[in-house]
């Protein structure tokens, strides 16, 4: 979490960089509420996504990017709550203009469930120590 603290104070942050896992859970809860609010607004306007909304309105709805530096730390402190928020966001947030960048050193199912992993369209892995970790990251198995 120290890596992201260097970004503290840049002008486009919606909130300060959060380094406490408990506070991160409450912020993720706010992001879920924001996503639901955006869905209600887009439904009222009759559009399917943020791009459609922004084409119809002078006051554009901004995109939100949520960056989670170490998912396993969050899962240790507030596992089920974090899992529920991330799962909901990974399934529905893109249309509302909310995107998640999530990092972890351990891509195992106790950190990132199969449902969450299936809803992230892109994965990047720099280096793994053993081959089975490649399968966990890329979510495929050789039979």
Predicted regions and their residues:
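P-loop NTPase motor-domain active sites and their immediate coupling elements
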Residues: 26-143
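Residues in soluble alpha-helical coiled-coils and helical-bundle/repeat scaffolds
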Residues: 15-22, 76-80
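P-loop NTPase switch/communication element
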Residues: 1-20, 27-29, 115
């Amino acid at each position: 979490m120290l890596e992201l603290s260097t970004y503290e104070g840049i002008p486009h942050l919606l909130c300060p960089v959060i380094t406490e896992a408990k506070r991160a859970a409450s912020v993720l809860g706010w992001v879920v509420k924001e996503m639901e609010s955006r869905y209600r607004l887009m439904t009222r306007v009759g559009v399917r996504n943020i791009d459609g909304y922004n084409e119809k309105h002078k006051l554009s709805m901004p995109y939100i990017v949520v960056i989670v530096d170490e998912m396993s730390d969050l899962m240790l402190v507030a596992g089920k709550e974090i899992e529920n928020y991330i799962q909901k966001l990974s399934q529905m947030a893109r249309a509302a203009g909310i995107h998640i960048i999530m990092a972890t050193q351990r891509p195992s199912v106790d950190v990132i469930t199969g449902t969450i992993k299936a809803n992230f369209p892109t994965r990047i892995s720099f280096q793994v120590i053993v081959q089975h970790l490649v399968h966990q990251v890329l979510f495929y198995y050789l039979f």
